[in-house]
């Protein structure tokens, strides 16, 4: 079978007239070391939904912004966002086998003012609402009986990264007496370590999450956890709930106390506002807190439909990212939250972005002739300033930086020291980094020279609340989707994980064959890897 990887996409992106304008503009980008002024910092700001996006320290001019807006129009980015939120099939590759389904995660929070009127979106929202009601009744009963105090979630990938990141972000709101534990890695030490922290298995609930009901790592960890309960003389069925699609092996009343549903139109990395996140976040913080989280996500979904670019924060951020990636040729982005509560947030957005847009073919199945998703990485500030910011300031590669920040801290506990509070010191540091990266410094000592022109943007809100956290999630989800729409790629599948799974299963069979000592090897190169383990016998 001939695969058309040798051909490149002939019809879009660099052939847009806006792209040609941007290529010309990129030959002489704005020099931030000369052009950054107080007026520019004041002028280049977009505001919506309680957030301000400060982008005066990006290397853009009004001409660049006009061309970027034109690019979004030529690629029909807003139309595609509307179609996605209406439930049209957006997860597809033309003429090749693909998942061929909607990407309707927005329906899981489309439960408030101005809901979508398209039939598929309404039907999906009603399904999500029914599951939330089922969850409310389940948790209400548990609270009345004060039965389960600890929750263990067994999941992997987006079913783990997203909920876990948002749990840490809201941990200051944890209900008294409640504790949450996470198991994801198939490394048995993950399970063993968690169970050393659980005080009473009798009062422990386990939520197993797998859309397909067959995820190998999750199934393996589930069996390890079930064995812990059996060893304690407890019936796992009375402690286990499942979150899966209807009809999967995990949709089984004989094995689970309760089953909550998700659907094939929700991708794992987009599943935090579905039951994947709802059960754990509602158990930990209460369902009203989760409801506020959904409200924030819904509001940013609506903002993503704004035709005014200066109010459509996700689209503007997407276009700034495309300018940096495709026209200034910066291959990576450091995502730096100046909030310790967001210590796992970059890991989640890393998956949302890189699994969505790490694609080398377009939706016609043709190899792209342009770069797609950047490498996303980072850690919270100010800690990161004392680790990898040296490279960002003086390294040979230009690394754009996206900063998340809040005016106020979470607990309201602070101290004035040497004339300022800790929060003021935090804010001073993040603004200083943006300024230093943009303007640089000239010195007679070359070791103290900073070249500048390192672009940054700052997403700023008053305070991290359940509402703003939901909006923040939607901001990044929609930003990533917009970039995929403009590039013409499928942001909603993840074939890149499949080949490794196939080969891992062959190696697993090789381990099993060696244990049985009955079958000769059918996977010689795999056997060659395993022989290295014999050295440690």
From Swiss-Prot:
InterPro entries given in the database record: G6P_Isomerase, G6P_Isomerase_C, Phosphoglucose_isomerase_CS, SIS_dom_sf, SIS_PGI_1, SIS_PGI_2
The organism's place on the tree of life at top rank: Bacteria
Pathway the protein takes part in: Carbohydrate biosynthesis; gluconeogenesis; Carbohydrate degradation; glycolysis; D-glyceraldehyde 3-phosphate and glycerone phosphate from D-glucose: step 2/4
EC number(s) given by UniProt: 5.3.1.9
Protein function: Catalyzes the reversible isomerization of glucose-6-phosphate to fructose-6-phosphate.
Assigned protein family: Belongs to the GPI family.
Name of the protein: Glucose-6-phosphate isomerase
């Amino acid at each position: 079978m001939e695969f058309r990887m040798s051909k490149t996409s002939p019809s879009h992106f660099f052939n847009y007239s806006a792209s040609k304008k941007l290529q010309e503009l990129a030959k002489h980008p704005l020099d931030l070391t000369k052009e950054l002024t107080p007026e520019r910092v004041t002028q280049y700001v977009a505001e919506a939904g309680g957030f301000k996006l400060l982008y005066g320290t990006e290397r853009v001019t009004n001409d660049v912004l006009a061309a970027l807006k034109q690019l979004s129009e030529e690629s029909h980015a807003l139309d595609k966002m509307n179609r996605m939120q209406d439930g049209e099939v957006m997860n597809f590759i033309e003429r090749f086998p693909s998942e061929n389904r909607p990407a309707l995660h927005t329906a899981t929070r489309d439960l408030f003012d101005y809901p979508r009127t398209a039939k598929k979106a309404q039907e999906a929202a009603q399904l999500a609402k029914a599951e939330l009601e089922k969850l409310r009744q389940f948790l209400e009963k548990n609270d009345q009986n004060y039965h389960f105090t600890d929750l263990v979630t067994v999941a992997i990938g987006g079913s783990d990264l997203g909920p876990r990141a948002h749990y840490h972000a809201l941990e200051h709101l944890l209900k008294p007496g409640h504790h949450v534990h996470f198991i994801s890695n198939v490394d048995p030490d993950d399970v063993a370590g968690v169970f050393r922290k659980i005080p009473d298995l009798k009062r422990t609930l386990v939520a197993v999450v797998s859309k397909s009901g067959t995820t190998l790592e999750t199934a393996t960890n589930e069996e390890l956890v079930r064995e812990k309960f059996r060893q304690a003389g407890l019936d796992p069925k009375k402690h286990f709930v499942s979150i899966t699609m209807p009809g999967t092996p995990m949709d089984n009343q004989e094995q689970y106390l309760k089953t909550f549903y998700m659907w094939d139109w929700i991708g794992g990395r987009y599943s935090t506002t579905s039951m994947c996140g709802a059960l754990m976040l509602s158990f930990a913080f209460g369902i009203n807190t989760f409801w506020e989280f959904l409200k924030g996500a819904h509001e940013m979904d609506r903002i993503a439909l704004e035709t005014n670019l200066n109010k459509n924060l996700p689209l503007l951020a997407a276009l700034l990212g495309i300018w940096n990636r495709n026209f200034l040729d910066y291959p990576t982005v450091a995502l730096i939250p100046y909030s310790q509560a967001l210590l796992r947030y970059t890991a989640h957005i890393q998956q949302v972005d890189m699994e969505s847009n790490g694609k080398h073919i377009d939706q016609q199945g043709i190899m792209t002739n342009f770069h797609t998703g950047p490498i996303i990485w980072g850690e919270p500030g100010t800690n990161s300033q004392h680790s990898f910011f040296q490279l960002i300031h003086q390294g040979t590669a230009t690394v754009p930086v996206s900063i998340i920040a809040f005016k106020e801290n979470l607990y309201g506990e602070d101290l004035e020291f040497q004339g300022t509070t800790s929060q003021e010191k935090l804010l001073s540091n993040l603004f200083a980094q943006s300024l230093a990266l943009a303007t640089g410094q000239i010195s007679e000592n070359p070791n103290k020279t900073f070249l500048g022109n390192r672009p940054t943007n700052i997403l700023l809100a008053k305070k991290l609340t359940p509402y703003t956290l939901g909006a923040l999630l939607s901001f990044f989800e929609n930003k990533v989707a917009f970039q995929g729409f403009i590039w013409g790629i499928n942001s909603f599948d993840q074939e890149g994980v499949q080949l490794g799974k196939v080969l891992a299963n062959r190696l697993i069979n090789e381990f099993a064959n060696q244990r049985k000592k009955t079958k000769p090897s059918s996977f010689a190169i795999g056997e060659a890897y395993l022989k290295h383990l014999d050295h440690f016998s």
